[in-house]
Amino acid sequence: MLSIDKHLPAPHGLAAVLVRRAPKLVLPFLARSRSRLRATLDDGREVAVVLPRGTVMRGGDVLVAEDGTLVEVQAAPEQVLRVTSDSRLALMRAAYHLGNRHTPVQVVADALQLEADPVLEDMLVRLGVTVTHVQAPFEPEAGAYGGGHRHGHDATFEEDYAAAQALYREHHGHSHDRGCDHSHSHSHDHDHDHGHVHGPGCGHAPHHRHD
């Protein structure tokens, strides 16, 4: 069994012919995100990988065994969700909700890709984007998986969705500016109150009452 303890992220500067001739370690993203594992190379040899904790192997990276053997990492095709939309705004909103859940996401041309998950798929459909199942290598953005891998299996989507809708209405419907056409009241429990916050163009005389 080969023991591997060195990881060379791409671009590693090794001669292309050496990498091309090297045996391949073909793994899905979940396995490539483990720093310790046993696996089988494409030539049938067994390997034990022991890398620094937190290491994520990417397609094109090279591993070096204790005996000097080079091994090229390849991202295995796996079941992923591909998210597309004719509306750039809808796709941006989908990316926001996925990021809010710390979901690993791969950004490709005009699409997002993520690990297959029925709950997240339902959320995305409700957001109005198109979701298709494809077999493809999965290479999420670096750091997207930091802080844990959390799916939307909770009630936070309803709150996030409402907040996103409210934000959209605020920017595309009614908005407040410095001219303050109407008043806002703010009550306080301390000894004085401010009935209105005055700004340029307000048109109201200042009033500040002390008891």
Curated annotation (Swiss-Prot):
It is found in: Cytoplasm. It holds the Pfam family UreE_N. Residues 170-211 are annotated as: Disordered. GO terms for biological process: protein folding; protein-containing complex assembly; urea metabolic process. The keyword Chaperone applies. Residues 176-196 have a biased composition (Basic and acidic residues). One of its GO terms (molecular function) is unfolded protein binding. GO terms for cellular component: cytoplasm. Keywords: Chaperone, Cytoplasm, Nickel, Nickel insertion. The keyword Cytoplasm applies. Its main location: cytoplasm. InterPro entries: UreE, UreE_C_dom, UreE_N, UreE_N_sf. Belongs to the UreE family. Involved in urease metallocenter assembly. Binds nickel. Probably functions as a nickel donor during metallocenter assembly. This is Urease accessory protein UreE. The lineage of its organism: Bacteria, Pseudomonadati, Pseudomonadota, Betaproteobacteria, Burkholderiales. The gene is ureE.
